[in-house]
Amino acid sequence: METVFDYNQIKEIIPHRQPFLLIDRVVEYEEGQRCVAIKQVSGNEPFFQGHFPDYAVMPGVLITEALAQTGAVALLNSEQNKGKIALFAGIDKCRFKRQVTPGDTLTLEVEITKMRGPIGKGTAKATVDGQLACSCELTFAIQDV
């Protein structure tokens, strides 16, 4: 997959930084509508030190955060939203179907389905090798910093 935004370009769009920037690159992008990002899950991730030391599994809340960051890229790279922040305002219908472990390539896809003023909703899914790991509906609140 071709890179649309690399790691440094992502940091110009969303305010997240290490160790909490959870997407490595964007491979598909439609302004304000859709974004697909990739996270290479490494055994060196800090969360694996405690989740779990002898059985490394990426925490589900971090998978949903990675999805939220992917959605934030879709929303914040538009001219009207540059310099703003997208807050994670809600999550519905979240389901985890598969564990995500070191060595996995996590594909994160978010489609924005509704915008009403500064509030947006989207459908999201995370997959590994085409297998569904997580699906949910996200709510975003865009605001000035």
UniProtKB/Swiss-Prot annotation:
In its UniProt entry, what is this protein called?
3-hydroxyacyl-[acyl-carrier-protein] dehydratase FabZ
Principal localization reads cytoplasm
> Which CDD domains does the entry mention?
FabZ (cd01288)
The active-site annotation reads 51
Q: Name one GO cellular component term.
A: membrane
Main EC class of this protein?
A: lyase
Q: Which UniProt keywords apply?
A: Cytoplasm, Lipid A biosynthesis, Lipid biosynthesis, Lipid metabolism, Lyase
Q: What's this protein's family per the entry? A: Belongs to the thioester dehydratase family. FabZ subfamily.
Cytoplasm in keyword set = yes
Q: GO biological process: what's one of them?
A: fatty acid biosynthetic process
Is tRNA-binding among the key words of this record?
no
Q: Where in the cell is it found?
A: Cytoplasm
